[in-house]
Design a protein with these regions (language model features):
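Alpha-helical solenoid repeat scaffolds of the TPR/TPR-like class and their adjacent stem/linker regions
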Residues: 1-396, 400-468
Length: 468
């Protein structure tokens, strides 16, 4: 209507761009902002929002140019400084990001977003105390800011403050990242304190397959108290968890009737189990295996491995199904794996479940190493059988994916290659147990040293086994 009344209105086109952006129509939003600039070339807010859209499209250089144009027209625009900081951070230019956030905060010291985003960059740099301080400043301004609570929880967990970190993690449902995945029941959540005697509890998965497996290690603690335990999880996990926890009712996740259900007394998201059993979780590093694939299938895979040649038999995985920009530093290339792959006298087995064919060919062509792949195994969906294969292997080498959680769960020796500055570099989100050895790299380091150390470990184990 505004454009019909005044078709040369820069403000009207700008507002239209904002509406289109909110609706996810990014190209149309840029077109509307550009029309606003036709009528007012010095419209700093339009340049700023073009930058936001370009960043949403992962066009970071173009976004930075748009933010710089906005700042040239409006030098005291705290929002544009914060936005360009976000773009620098997405590029990995962390120092530039910090400079931009500090400039934003010098103009608007009460920006919870700038404090929170700067804290996240501090965490990526491994400056966890600075991250905790920045998150705390954001929360002093707005105590209900869910994103800051969520980020603070990761920082606290990563410095070993388990109790406080787990308390903060309960705020995740007010974070923009998690709010849409929250389930809504008429029954109140279990608070972790009230007795579960003669009570039925529903535990529901909330994140990835690996997280569900990791948190399932707490199920014996629940079943020792509750009359009945229902677990709703990813459908492909149902066979593995049902076999491993026969006294738990394991079902595929179903959200269709949440507010009408009456088959339990209290629900709880699985990510809250560690908080409910904090003292027991602190001893988890010494816990036994908790996943139990079929022994007949373990023997099948062991015999199949033996038929392929001499051991040790080493499974490898180097990336995830989710390779978003934020997660990329968690993952390695096949070239990074070369210190392990060139070990003599080792039979390598592929445990990668997505996008592996080209990588296996590259390993064969560049290193002359065969990584055996079982075409008859659905690595992505048949997790009960994958667990049996993992249990048959001698060693598993993996970055962050479902694989090290399965291998840790079945008790196979696991060499876990981890990005130290990852928000998830803690016991809540990492595989732990007596069979897990963690090898960390810093943001500013390559993976080479990590896989070199893993290779040395495997070589020593191979020597020990041969002597035995």
């Amino acid at each position: 209507k505004a454009l019909a009344l005044k078709p040369d209105s820069a403000v009207a086109f700008y507002n239209m761009g904002n509406v289109l952006k909110e609706r996810g129509k990014l190209e149309e939003a840029i077109e509307a902002y550009n029309k606003a600039l036709v009528f007012n070339p010095d419209y700093a807010d339009a340049h700023n929002n073009i930058g936001n859209v370009l960043q949403d499209q992962s066009k970071l250089e173009d976004a930075i140019s748009a933010f710089k144009k906005a700042l040239s027209l409006k030098p005291n625009c705290a929002e544009a400084y914060c936005n360009i900081g976000n773009a620098f951070a997405a590029q990995g230019n962390l120092e530039e990001a910090i400079i931009a956030y500090r400039k934003s905060l010098s103009i608007n010291p009460d920006s919870v977003v700038a404090h929170s985003h700067m804290a996240a960059v501090f965490a990526d740099q491994g400056k966890l105390e600075e991250a905790i301080e920045a998150y705390s400043k954001a929360l002093a301004i707005n105590p209900d800011y869910g994103d800051a609570h969520n980020g603070l929880s990761f920082a606290l967990l990563n410095v070993g403050e388990l109790k406080r970190g787990l308390d903060e993690y309960e705020w995740r449902w007010k974070s923009t990242k998690y709010i849409s995945s929250k389930r809504h029941f008429s029954q109140p959540l279990w608070d972790g304190q009230k007795s579960l005697k003669n009570k039925k509890i529903l535990l529901w998965c909330e994140q990835g397959v690996g997280d569900t497996i990791n948190w399932a290690s707490c199920l014996p603690l629940v079943t020792s108290q509750a009359k009945h335990c229902i677990v709703e999880c990813q459908e492909k996990l149902v066979p593995l968890l049902s076999r491993s926890f026969p006294n738990v009712e394991v079902k595929p996740e179903n959200r269709s009737l949440d507010t009408e259900r009456n088959d339990f007394d209290s629900p709880l998201p699985m990510g809250s189990l560690y908080r409910s059993f904090a003292s027991e979780v602190s001893r988890k590093a010494k816990a036994d295996a908790f996943l139990f694939p079929d022994p007949v299938r373990i023997n099948f895979w062991r015999n199949r491995l033996i038929s392929m040649g001499k051991g040790p038999y080493v499974g490898i995985s180097w990336k995830s199904a989710n390779m978003s920009a934020k997660r990329l530093p968690n993952y390695a290339s096949t070239s990074d794996l070369s210190p392990v792959l060139t070990l003599p006298g080792v039979t390598f087995i592929n445990l990668q479940y997505v996008d592996f064919a080209d990588d296996l060919s590259k390993i064969q062509n560049e290193l002359g190493v065969t990584v055996h792949h079982f075409d008859d195994l659905d690595h992505y969906n048949d997790l009960l059988e994958v667990a049996a294969l993992c249990a048959a292997l001698d060693i598993i080498v993996s970055t962050t994916s479902a694989v090290p959680f399965i291998s840790a769960g079945v008790g196979t020796l696991t060499k876990f290659a981890s990005w130290k500055q990852s928000p998830w570099s803690n016991n809540l989100f990492n595989p732990v147990g007596p069979s897990v050895d963690k090898f960390e790299r810093n943001t500013w380091q390559s993976w080479h040293n990590v896989f070199h150390l893993i290779a040395e470990d495997i070589l020593k184990l191979s020597d020990d086994w041969s002597h035995q």
